[in-house]
Amino acid sequence: MKKFPDIRTFSWKSTKTQQWNTVTKRSGSGRVRTMTTWRYPQWTITTQFAYLTPAQYKTIMGFFASLKGAYEPFLWLDPEDHCERGVQLGVGRDGRFRAVRRWGIYLEPVEYVEDVTVYADGQVVPSRVERGEIHLVNAVGADAIITADYTYYWQVMLAEDKFAVEAVFRDFYKSKSFKLVTCR
């Protein structure tokens, strides 16, 4: 899967919107029943580039053209939400752990992680990663507390089939606002 180009000139005006698909039924007596049909939320990220050099302009236009707009998902390294440090994954007897991102008390699994360092009771232990699952290479104590540090990517796609860039001055570009939506 392609990674979004490393261009860090986003404007500070960006938003993340969390959406669930909740079905609500109300009986004649007023009793309410709810059910969600999604296991995890869909996120919509709205952002824009405040500044692009001519080289960055060509890079980003080429990237979106290679995706054919919203046709192909890609990996997004979010400027604010992209790493976990000291996240507790479980205890040693399990041996396999799901990488997650923390939102307060809510944990959401992530599939694309890199720069992973795993600790058993605070000591670095060797590990390998496969689609968001962290495997310990060697056995550790059954009650060892397993924590990890890692960088994660969001799997997203363009919400629309278009991406617009404005030429502000000579050799100075900025993008219009664009939306990304998570996909699984």
What are the functions of these language-model segments?
Residues 1-22:
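Polar/acidic, low-complexity leader/linker segments enriched in S/T/G and N/D
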Residues 23-33:
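Short, solvent-exposed beta-alpha or beta-beta edge segments that form flexible loop/patches at the rim
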Residues 33-54, 165-184:
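Oligomerization/assembly interface segments of phage tail-like spikes and tubes
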Residues 44, 113-117, 145:
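Exposed beta-strand and adjacent loop surfaces of beta-rich binding modules
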Residues 49, 145-152:
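Short, hydrophobic/aromatic-enriched beta-strand segments in well-ordered soluble domains
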Residues 54-60:
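Short, conserved charged micro-motifs
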Residues 61-128, 150-184:
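Extended beta-strand solenoid/passenger and fiber regions
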Residues 123-144:
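A surface-exposed beta-strand-loop module
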